[in-house]
A protein has these predicted regions:
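Short glycine-enriched, charge-decorated loop/helix-capping segments at active-site entrances
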Residues: 152-157, 229-231
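A conserved beta-strand element that flanks and buttresses the S-adenosyl-L-methionine
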Residues: 139, 144, 148
């Protein structure tokens, strides 16, 4: 909740790191250090206590979803792609590295100039800047489930994500492809974090599109071409459904 920087300040102020391995390591470091400019000083302490016993590399669902979608888009030979709310430091970066022009649809301009990345200022629930049947490649990876819950400062609106889904398929051209991911399980809202959907609910919402592939990420792994109903009542972790649709 606090974030790493703020938690570190909290840990230092309240001595959370004291009587832990950090204190022992400080003593050892100080006894061995021969460079005065690199001596430990109280004002520069930045104690991190979680990393020592953390797994060196955990492949999260976000890693797999970003890789899954990017590989498919690159393989399709797409030159220009549109996106709603996906991770810039993962999925979008993959596409940019492959030389694909990416148009991010957002109500706010992107704060930094990045080669190949353009912001289209638009409300994703309306997509008023786009003609019907005009988009050939579009994605929304783990973003639509957050719409209308107020978590990111957006207006509270229970229908917001469903309006966006309706507009996406309306704006897609014949032969166009949609890459979408959402949490999978029993239909529900876990306010104000996100919504969870049956896989079949997503398929029924995008009734103007054909499902090409449904895969899932689960606890650091990916399962390709999963059964639609396999995770309807799954409660052993967070499952992300990966949907590829074509119009």
């Amino acid at each position: 909740v606090l974030g790493e920087k703020n938690y570190t300040r909290y840990a230092q102020e309240y001595g959370v790191w004291r009587n832990t391995f950090v204190e022992d390591d400080m003593v050892k470091y100080s006894s061995m250090n021969v460079r005065p400019e690199f001596a430990i000083k109280e004002e520069y302490l930045y104690p991190l206590i979680a990393d020592k016993y953390d797994t060196s590399c955990i492949l999260t669902g976000y890693f797999w979803q970003d890789l899954w979608a990017a590989k498919k888009i690159i393989a399709e030979g797409v030159k220009e792609h549109f996106d709603i709310g996906s991770r810039v430091d993962g999925f979008i970066a993959h596409l940019l590295a492959a030389g694909i022009k990416v148009n991010v649809i957002d109500i706010r301009p992107f704060p930094t100039k990045v080669e190949g990345l353009t912001t289209i200022l638009d409300d994703a629930t309306m997509l008023s800047q786009f003609e019907d049947d005009s988009i050939s490649s579009i994605s929304a990876l783990c973003s639509l489930e957050h719409f209308g819950l107020g978590r990111y400062g957006d207006p509270v609106d229970p229908e917001s994500c469903f309006q966006c889904m309706a507009q996406i398929q309306k704006k897609m051209k014949k032969g166009g492809r949609l890459y979408i991911s959402v949490p999978i399980g029993q239909n529900r809202v876990e306010f104000n974090a996100h919504r969870v959907f049956y896989a079949d609910t997503i398929i029924s919402i995008f009734d103007q599109l054909n499902l090409v592939e449904y895969s899932v990420t689960d606890n650091g792994d990916i399962e390709y071409n999963a059964d639609i109903h396999k995770y309807d009542s799954y409660d052993k972790g967070r499952v992300i459904g990966l949907f590829l649709f074509e119009k």
